[in-house]
């Protein structure tokens, strides 16, 4: 008799995705981040659901409802901090996952890659709206500053901003709709993640060498299920260490002050995972130019498959490209640092140089470098 997992319509899908899936025999720990992102999404949805049971999306009570969760709800503090720091873990995994894709040339699976970019935008939108919900000073002013950027769109900008606000400023209507969107988006993300996997399983996984691995495949279970389980253990350990020992390490103290439209914080800045994009936005003196650069800083990932000029897929055997890749990583870390600094000398010029280098590396240096490496192959 055939095993039920191979015949049952629902079990069959799970079987082909997670059990009998042929996987390359040599994929490294860098391939763990897909499953870790799934775990992060699961943690965020579960903790978020429990938070939503006690949260009120009203300007008068939002801040005190979060305080109530932390003080009066059983284990509310750990749920709240797991949700807040879970977002940080989510973005750490996201950045490493995208970095892996760039390094090993996984972007040549263009459908999977493009769905991934959509996922990145969706997660960023969700995180932004979630940051507004506690209705602290940074929540309010962050929402005001970022939504205001849409006013840079010619002709319809101002109307668009007021439409999103539901009034003439960030107020009760804005908070309520942000809560609604923050609740629904993770489920859209989960659906997109399934499409992401669907496209990935059409082609099969890439591997560190970038060479087609059809000749040497192994079953996903037990080899990669146990490997993923180890990754889960690491992630949960790191998350719990952060939550239990230093829950406010990555937060902003200003957000423990209730939102006050009459008092602007000295430095309005987003959470750490948006600082690189915020630095790019600030590095351009023109408002519309800044917004354009902000969107392009992520959207530029979509042109990576078109800019792949190398005869090899992976950077594993391309030392010059590797150097440029690590310069790009260092550049992003520099941008993250600059995003958290005040707008004054020398931070302004450093931010402008780092922003220029970011686009110049991806659009010019890396493709040219790949062409040079192609020539070196003929020696």
From Swiss-Prot:
Molecular-function GO term, any one: ubiquinol-cytochrome-c reductase activity
Record GO biological process: mitochondrial electron transport, ubiquinol to cytochrome c
Q: Which cysteines are joined by disulfide bonds?
A: none
List the record's Gene Ontology CC terms alphabetically.
mitochondrial inner membrane; respiratory chain complex III
Q: Which residues take part in binding heme b b566?
A: 97, 196
What keywords are assigned to this protein? Electron transport, Heme, Iron, Membrane, Metal-binding, Mitochondrion, Mitochondrion inner membrane, Respiratory chain, Transmembrane, Transmembrane helix, Transport, Ubiquinone
Note on file? Answer: Heme 1 (or BL or b562) is low-potential and absorbs at about 562 nm, and heme 2 (or BH or b566) is high-potential and absorbs at about 566 nm.
Output this protein's name.
Cytochrome b
Organism of derivation? Ochotona forresti (Forrest's pika)
């Amino acid at each position: 008799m055939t095993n039920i997992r191979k015949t049952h319509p629902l079990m069959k899908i799970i079987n082909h995705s997670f059990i009998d899936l042929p996987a390359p025999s040599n994929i490294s720990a860098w391939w763990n981040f897909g499953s870790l992102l799934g775990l992060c999404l699961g943690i965020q949805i579960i903790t978020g659901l429990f938070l939503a049971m006690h949260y009120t999306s009203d300007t008068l009570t939002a801040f005190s409802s979060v305080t109530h969760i932390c003080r009066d709800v059983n284990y509310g503090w750990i749920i709240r901090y797991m949700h807040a720091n879970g977002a940080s873990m989510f973005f750490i995994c996201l950045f490493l996952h995208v970095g892996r894709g760039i390094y090993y040339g996984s972007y040549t699976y263009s459908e999977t890659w493009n769905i991934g970019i959509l996922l990145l935008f969706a997660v960023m939108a969700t995180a932004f709206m979630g940051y507004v919900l506690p209705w602290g000073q940074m929540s309010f002013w962050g929402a005001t500053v970022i939504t205001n950027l849409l006013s840079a769109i010619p002709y319809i900008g101002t109307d668009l901003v007021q439409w999103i606000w539901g009034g003439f400023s960030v107020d009760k209507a804005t908070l309520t709709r942000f809560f609604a969107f923050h609740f629904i988006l993770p489920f859209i993300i989960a659906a997109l993640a399934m499409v992401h996997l669907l496209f990935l399983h059409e082609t099969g996984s890439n591997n560190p060498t970038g060479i087609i691995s059809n000749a040497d495949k192994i079953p996903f279970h037990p080899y990669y299920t146990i490997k993923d389980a180890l990754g889960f253990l690491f992630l949960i350990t790191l998350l719990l260490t952060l939550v239990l020992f230093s829950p406010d390490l990555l937060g902003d103290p200003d957000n423990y002050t209730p939102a006050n439209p009459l008092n602007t914080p000295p430095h309005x800045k987003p959470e750490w995972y948006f600082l690189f994009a915020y630095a790019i936005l600030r590095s351009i003196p023109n408002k519309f130019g800044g917004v354009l650069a902000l969107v392009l800083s992520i959207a530029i990932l979509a042109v990576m498959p078109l800019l792949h000029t190398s005869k090899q897929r992976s950077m594993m055997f391309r030392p010059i490209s590797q150097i440029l890749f690590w310069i790009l990583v260092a550049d992003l870390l520099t941008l993250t640092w600059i995003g958290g600094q005040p707008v004054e000398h020398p931070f302004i010029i450093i931010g402008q140089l780092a922003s220029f280098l970011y686009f110049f590396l991806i659009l010019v240096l890396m493709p040219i470098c790949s062409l040079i490496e192609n020539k070196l192959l003929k020696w």
